[in-house]
Amino acid sequence: MSIPLILASKSKPRRDVLYSAGICPTIRVSHVDEPAALEAAAREEGVTVDDLSIKQRVMILAVAKAEAVHRAYRDVADTAAAATGDRVIAYPLKAKEIKDSEREAAVEDLREAAAGKPIDYSKAEIATTRDFSGIDMPTVTEPIATAIAGQPGLTEATVGPLILGCDSMFLLGGECYGKPHSEAVASERLKRMSGATGELWTGHCLIDFATGRTVRGASHAKVHFGEFTDADVERYIATGEPLEVAGSFTLEGFGGAFIDSIEGDPHGIIGLSLPLARHLAGELGITWTDLWNVGRGELEPESKASGNQHAGILPPVENVHQPGDGWVDCACGRKHWGTNGASGILLARRDPVSGKVTHVVMQHRAAWSAEGGTWGIPGGATADGESPIEGALRESYEEANITPEDIEVVGSYREDHGPWAYTTVFAFEKPGHTVEPKANDDESMEICWVPIDDVPNRKLLTAMKTDWPRFAARLDELATAQ
C-alpha cells in the first residue's frame, strides 16, 4: 500500500500538481494566521517582518502550516489510542429477515441504476441506506482496544503519513507580494508586472508523522512577463483568478498566456515543486514512487453529489477528490460513500451533577449531499492510512469543529455490510472541557447541540432514524458507567 500524503493546504492547483504526478493527497487546511506567524518569527529574530527575506517568509509559513496539521493529527491519534469501552459489530445482511432473494433483487436494481442515467445522489433511493429497523441483526462485541490494535492507522504506522506544508510569495522590484485579496491591489500589482521580471518563491516543509522527522527547503524561479494593456488587466481581474493567488497571476490558468518565459521549476510557480518535494522525501528515506496512489490516466471517481446538476443543486466547485472518496456498490443493493468505509462521531454532553446525557451534536446536511436536508452526525469517508475511529475524529473536526483533544471515546458501533461498513463512534466531552460545534465547511447547513429528547423530532438520515433508539439507550448505559 502506498504511503499517504497529507497536503496542509486547500490550494486546488497544488493538489492538482500532485494528482497529475500520481499522488492523490488528503487535504487538511492548517488555519494558520499568516500575518501573526510572520510577526512572531520576526520578534524571535529581533527584527520586523519587513526585514525578513522572501525566502525566510515562505519557509516560516510552510513550517507553520505543516506543524499545525501535524499537531492536529497528533491530537486525533492520541484520542483514538486512548479510546475505552466496547466495539459492537452488527451484520444486518446476515439476519434471517434478509432473504437471499431480496439481496439478489437489490443488487439487480443497483446494476440497472448504474447502467442508466446519472444518479442524483441527494435524492436517489439507491444512495439511501436501507432501513433495517425491526430486523434482529447478529452482533459481536469486543473490547475497542482489540479493534484498534487490529486495524491499520496513525497509531500503528512505522512510516508516514507525510505532511506537506507550502507557501508561495512573489518578489518584484524588491517588494514581496502575497495574495492581493482585492481588485484594487491586484490591478496595481499587475500593471507593475507588465513587461517586467520577478521571482516566485515557494517554501516546503515535509514531516513524517510516524517518526516526527522534519525536512524543509525552498524553490524559486524567475518569471518574465509579456506586456499587457490596462484592458487586459481589467478582464483578467474580472475572472477572479488573480485575487487569491500569490503574485496575482497563475501559470496554469488565464494568466499563463501573459508569461513569456520561466527560468527554474514551473511547478514551483504553481505552488509546489515536485523535484524539491521528491528530494525532501528522499531525505526522510522515503522513495517518491512509494507515494503513488493514482494510475496513469486514471479518472477521478464520481463526487458525493454526482448527478445533482440535473436537480439544480450543485456542490461547491472547490470540492476535490481525496483518498477514500468514492461510491461503493454494496451487497445490500445500495451505493455507499467511502471506498474504505465511513465513520462519524456521536458526541454527547452530560449534566455535570447527575451525569445524564442532555445533548448530542448533530449535523444538518447540505442539500447537495446524499439525503440532503436531513439530520445526522458529522463524519465521512475513512482516508487511506487511518482507522475508522481516527477518520471519525478527523472528519468531525473538519466538518463540525469537534476538537479531539476535548473529547474521550467510550465505545463504537460498526454496521458491517461486507464490502462497506459505517462506524459510529460514541464520545463524551472530557470533564472540564467544552466543545463548541460549528460548520467548518460546506457539507453542513448547520451544526449544533441538540437536546437529547428532541432528536427523534428532527428529519433524520435514514440510518440514524433506524439506529437512534439503540444509540440513545447505549449513551445512557455509557453515561451511567462513567
Swiss-Prot record:
The active site is at D167. It catalyses: a ribonucleoside 5'-triphosphate + H2O = a ribonucleoside 5'-phosphate + diphosphate + H(+); a 2'-deoxyribonucleoside 5'-triphosphate + H2O = a 2'-deoxyribonucleoside 5'-phosphate + diphosphate + H(+). The keyword Metal-binding does not apply. SUPFAM superfamilies: ITPase-like, Nudix. Residues 338-475 form the Nudix hydrolase domain. Residues 1-299 are annotated as: Maf-like. The keyword Cytoplasm applies. It is an enzyme of class 3 (hydrolase). Its cofactor is a divalent metal cation. It comes from the Bacteria. CDD domains: Maf (cd00555). GO terms for cellular component: cytoplasm. GO terms for biological process: nucleotide metabolic process. Keywords: Cytoplasm, Hydrolase, Nucleotide metabolism. In the N-terminal section; belongs to the Maf family. This is Nucleoside triphosphate pyrophosphatase/Nudix hydrolase fusion protein. It comes from Bifidobacterium longum (strain NCC 2705).
